[in-house]
Amino acid sequence: MTGAPPYNPQSPTQQPRFPVYSPPNKNRSYYPNNDQYQQHAPQTPPAFAPQPSLSRSPHYSHAPSPLPATLPPLNGGAPPPGHHPEPSSQYQTHSSAGTPQFSLPRPYSASMMSSNGASSYNHSTASHAHPSARLESLSQSPPKKETEPLYPIGGNGAPGYSSSMMREPRPASPPRETKHARAADPMSFASILSGPTEETSPIKQPSLPEALPGPATTITPAPPTLAPVPARRRLTPPPVTHALPPTSQLKVKEPEPISPAALPRLEKKPSAEKRRRNVEQEPKSAEALPVASTHGAFEPTKAARVSNRKTLTERDAEAINKIIAEIDNADKSDVESPGFEVEYGRYMVKSKKRALDAEKAEGIRRKRRRHDFLVKLGKTFEKQANAGVDRFRAANEASVIAEVQAKEIQDEKERKKDMQRKRRRENTVRLEMQKKLEAERKANKANDAAEKAKFLREAERAQRKIKSTKRALEGVTSPEEIGEVTPLAPNLEGGTTSSFHIGRSSPSRRKSGRSGTSRPKKSKEQKQAEKDAAEAAYAAMENDEPLPLAPKEDPRKETVKKEAKGARSKETTPAPVSAFESKGYNQIYEQIWRDIARKDIPKVYRIKTLSLSTRQENLRKTAQLASKQSRKWQERTNKSMKDTQARAKRTMREMMSFWKRNEREERDLRRLAEKQEIESAKKAEAEREANRQKRKLNFLISQTELYSHFIGRKIKGAGADSSGDTAVDGSDETIQPGKADHTIDLPPTVADVGAKVTNFEDLDFDAEDETALRQAALANAQNAVKEAQERARAFNAEENPMAALDEGELNFQNPTSLGDIEISQPKMLTAKLKEYQLKGLNWLVNLYEQGINGILADEMGLGKTIQSISVMAYLAEVHNIWGPFLVIAPASTLHNWQQEITKFVPDIKVLPYWGSAKDRKVLRKFWDRKHITYTKESEFHVLVTSYQLVVLDSQYFQKVKWQYMILDEAQAIKSSQSSRWKNLLGFHCRNRLLLTGTPIQNNMQELWALLHFIMPTLFDSHDEFSEWFSKDIESHAQSNTKLNEDQLRRLHMILKPFMLRRVKKHVQQELGDKVEKDVFCDLTYRQRAYYTNLRNRVSIMDLIEKAAVGDEADSTTLMNLVMQFRKVCNHPDLFERAETKSPFSVGYFAETASFVREGQNVDVRYSTRNLIEYNLPRLLCSPSGRIDMAGPGNEHAGFRGKYLQHLMNIFTPENIKRSIDEDGAFSFLRFADTSINEAYEQSHLGVFERAVRRRGQSNRLSHLNVIYDDEEDEKTSKFVLPHSLFNIVQRNDRQAVRNVTVEGYMRDLMNVSEATFERDGLGVIEPSASPAASAPPITISCSGQVALRETQDTFFNVSVRHALFSTPSRQMEQQILEKKLDPAPFSLPPMLPKPISTKGRYTHIEVPSMRRFVTDSGKLAKLDELLRELKAGGHRVLLYFQMTRMIDLMEEYLTYRNYKYCRLDGSTKLEDRRDTVADFQQRPEIFVFLLSTRAGGLGINLTAADTVIFYDSDWNPTIDSQAMDRAHRLGQTRQVTVYRLITRGTIEERIRKRALQKEEVQRVVISGGAAGGVDFNTRNRESRTKDIAMWLADDEQAELIEQKEKEALDRGEVFGAGKGGKKAAQKRKKDLTLDDMYHEGEGNFDDISAKPSGAATPVSTADNFGTPSSTPVPKRGRGRGNGKGSSKRAKTTTERLRLIDGDGGLES
């Protein structure tokens, strides 16, 4: 394995006891790149890894680089030197700078692997080569420096701890003069590396470790003097193994001194003789041994040599020889004395033992290092492998995911195809089974044998088709029977244990080389011939004729011919050996061979090949059968049993499926028969029920008709005879309040004394004879009349007996006949009643006298209010009945009622009953319940209140007996199930009068509720009557047939006595016309995108099915969807408003931990700072750091001011004068109109001071150029004075005359258009682009107070700010006022120019474009054009909306167009409504009145407007009619134009169509018009919900839904009712109508949930206690009422559909 050792920061096998390596010092002449590590080339790992301390070094803690050794150093480092030492110089010496010179060990020689470039440890020499002729493969450990720890070996061979491990690693110290000290322990790591301690070399330098325990001591050497050495001494190896450095290093650094630690420190030195003798006693063979350490540091025949060694001179040689001779002649030491050999031998034994121990310890270390290296190398490879996996994954993960997804999609497609294929096959099996059964049935019935055989063949054919299809369904692809392949019969009893012949096909008879050829294409003629042949064969099969078989053709015939032609040999056939050699003979011979090769050989080859393949096939089959037969003895398995069980199970399944199918068919037939019977029974029952309902209806109409006749004849008297109504005679009697026993004599034509009142439940409607029903109806009508009389008589009888004294005043005993005497207008009424209003008064008075309630249904604007007030005035004036009267009206008309009563009848006192609960409690003190008779002096006569307060204080109202109760806008009680209707019905009142302009709003059930309210006993809420209204009329409307004219006529007859209705065009001729126009708008691109996206999210079919179920939640969801679509049509900003944009601000903003400690006002105007700040020293910002500012710390300021600004300044007056006199540099001043002093002053002033002084100079002469400008006289016009020759701008700034006056009233008078242009904001320009980011100016930061104070003085200088912005300070303005000075000199124009963008001012904040706001909506764009035309024509507009949020957006638009407007919706306070209406009526400058359709369409008079615009229409046309009649009413003198904005191709068109149908209902029922094709919209809840769902569909979807509905109706099913049956059975929590859901949150005055939006018009946060709409809302939460709180549970799919646009709900 090759590669550099992995230098990880912490190896997992390192022991914690190893000390940390101290990194090398960088303070040296060459440290490549100053990086933490160097890359290394791959190397073979050494015998032992570097020291653990080295591995832990942060400078060498990275994985090896895979770069080759030839790469240059990184980051421009110094390249390795080219010098390589000798092969023997294995290790580098330490440098003099103390940097450890470790090199990477290499086990190979320089001849096998070259050097790896730069040293990894920053050596100046890069070679790591070893001796080339080394015999061992172990490498030498690198030498250690002085400060490196030692690793001694203990006595048992285990590694011990050195003293250096207890100290922190320290950096390398500079070299000292001491030599290396050899370790005291010869077995330590440094000791082994420093001396020749090999076992094979007996000649060693002895050392005694036992004598010197502990760390090695150093010996200070003597001065380096050389002595002559004998030749035998030179053969002794050196005491250390350190290689000497090269000569280049010896020149710069001193050589590393040899450590004497290898020598024992003896007190007495041995003599030279003894040492020489011991040396001579060594065997001579030691010279041949390698003089190297244990690890092979030196070669056997080579010693470490020093390059460039100095040659000894003769004098030196003589001195050395002399010293050697003295040593030889010296006395022998104790060591050389005899007897030391024993000690020497003992020492050698111990040395060998130590060497063995060292080798053992080194082997342990080597194994550990090898293990660590392999672990690290494995981790490195694992890391590289993981990196490779990551790279592969990053490169291919996306494609793999895409491939997997594509495969999944393809699998899903295949699965769907398989399912479709399976279904088709199952259908095929079912159909073939039917064919088979039908054929067998026909065969059984057939009499002719041929016909029976034909049917049997069809059955057999169907059976075969069923069998093959079933096999295809089961997935069986093998041959059907074994006998078709083998000649033997199939073994059905037992199985076989071999699968040799299963699933293997016979070998192909064609060669593999021909399998890839494509089939030749057939021509059209061949295809047609094949089709004809197939048809002929099918016809023959049908006729049982034998099929004509064509001769079998060889399919390869043509191919072989073509191949034979192509393969025809062009070479001549070799001539046979013959005696004839003529040319003709050879030609004939070759021709014969060619014919044979072309014709016979391919044929013979084919025959042979076919024969061979047949024989091989037979042999294969025979082998298979033989193999099967030979293994029959192994067939003793349970396969036969399993096959039997499988066949039995399959048979059972087939039987079960057959019987199930048979039972299902029988059950279907039985159900079909039962269904037909039930349908026929239903039809019969429906016919009987229709007859029964018809009799019920006839009874109810007859009863009501008789009552109407009684009342009509009573009111009309004899006048009824002239009208032709002779069914009932009239009567002139009235109810007299004074006599309790008075009765009205019924006419003799209908009076039946013996008639018996019958309950409705006891009547028999099944009888064919209707005589009993007619008698019961007559009796019930008589009883109803009597009850009405008794009720009125009882109310009068309960009056105070004191009223009998004034019986002459209460003239109820002598009523007048309507035909003889007409009631005149009351005198106390200040207004003049019109003719039709006087007739209405007569009708109301007659109703009151008869004790009958009525409905005044005049069209809006005809004066229903004044007619009601005239009735009260009549009762007070004629009959002295002063009340109490109760008027209940919507909240918006309360003030109007109070004002009208006070205005027209001042004698009648009005009590306005509204306000908070405390206010109402005070008002109730005026109710005098003790005195029933109210007089003219009573506290009040009429009480005016609202519907909400009536419900709240119903317990107080029920205690009072009211003479007359008037309900204004009576459609508020259209629901007989509401609490309002029930509370009002329970009040004690003599008569009730309902005022409504629209008696029929949505359906006829509302009209029936009003009739039931006025006559509860007669117009009872019978279910049959309501059912007739809801079903019978609808059935006629759906079938587009005419309604029963007799029933419609009788219905009108019912309504005539109780309801009076007049239309404007019939009674009011002076009232202007009303023109209605539908303005169609198109969707914009944004609206179309929203609309399409919204429709794509919703399934119309699901909505239809849910609507058929009729669930409450689904209905609410549907209405939410309708609202979302209407929002899109109105404006897309109802979903999402355009945001205000601003560039990204690169800066710091003010922050605070808490605003509590910041005080009341926090000034953050100058708290924004730039991210870039220049931090300057405090000295530089102080006066001491600037040479031009004098101060205690600046001594040079005076010098600069004296010499630089005065002596050396060229702008001094003396220098300028001298220069002008000498025509020098300043001679131009004479032409610039500048004096010497002015030039001197300008040189000492800054730019800002000069600009301020320039602004103060007036240029009045230039204005005169306009007057004295003479274009003809060129001399005069171009005349320039010499002293102002260079002043080009001063007198050439020509301006218009209107701009000459820059201030005062004259400028305003001369610039009216410009001032108007600027004031109206017409010059506002929107910027076309904005920067992406902005930042405050870069500031200078200094920590000194002086710099901060100077910065603030500069930025907030009052004089500078006044000059730049021309805004005088508050103190200056106060002084101007106090001293009464002229403000003109102090109001100079600002010096800063106007901003580039007038719209954005000095900022880049972009407000959403109003132009885009207008063009984003098709309606708003069309409205913009329309309002512009109306404004130019002097019209005033009422603008109606359905959504209050749209009103908020419209306020922004009107502000943008500068149209004055006022607003009124459900959130407007009661006291503000009156003032708002009065302002619009009295101030012509108000152009637009914004109103909510439900809030602003009731009871207010807005005749000042002549144009009504419906931004979005209501689906109830009566609401829109009421809204437009606010302007088209009495008092309107101009023509009223109504514009209705409709978005083309959307839901609004369908809503408008539905509204037109409702208008037709009103026309038919009220006016008596034709009823053809009218949809009365009285269907049940589910049908109406389905109609709403149909609005969301387009024309194609609607057509498809209608087609499916028709198909379901043909099947006798209800479309969409098959799902969700359980949901339909759920009980609804609240019967909330679709109309209520649709208008939820629209701002209806009667809606207590209406809240002010506050989006565009600020509203007060205080509780509106003064308005009737401020009803306390129940608290939200569990058990706290019906408040709608936001739920934290997960949203269902239905709820998510409601929140499509993130807006949710129906709130607009």
Curated annotation (Swiss-Prot):
Any one GO cellular component localisation term in the record: chromosome, centromeric region
Biased composition (Basic and acidic residues): 265-285, 408-417, 426-463, 523-534, 551-571, 632-646, 1692-1701
PROSITE patterns xref list: DBINO, HELICASE_ATP_BIND_1, HELICASE_CTER
Membrane spanning residue stretches: none
Keywords for this protein: Activator, ATP-binding, Coiled coil, DNA damage, DNA repair, DNA-binding, Hydrolase, Nucleotide-binding, Nucleus, Transcription, Transcription regulation
Extent of motif DEAQ box: 968-971
InterPro entries named in the record: DBINO, DEXQc_INO80, Helicase_ATP-bd, Helicase_C-like, INO80/SWR1_helicase, P-loop_NTPase, SNF2-like_sf, SNF2/RAD54-like_C
Coiled coil (residue ranges): 395-478, 634-706
UniProt feature, compositional bias: Basic residues: 507-522, 1675-1691
Domain Helicase C-terminal: 1422-1582
GO molecular function: ATP binding; ATP hydrolysis activity; ATP-dependent chromatin remodeler activity; DNA binding; histone binding
Helicase ATP-binding domain ranges (all copies): 845-1017
Polar residues: compositionally biased ranges: 24-37, 88-102, 1658-1672
Residue ranges occupied by any DBINO domain in the UniProt entry: 592-717
Description of how the protein assembles with itself and partners: Component of the INO80 chromatin-remodeling complex.
Description of its domains: The DBINO region is involved in binding to DNA.
UniProt protein name: Chromatin-remodeling ATPase INO80
Organism (species): Aspergillus fumigatus (strain ATCC MYA-4609 / CBS 101355 / FGSC A1100 / Af293)
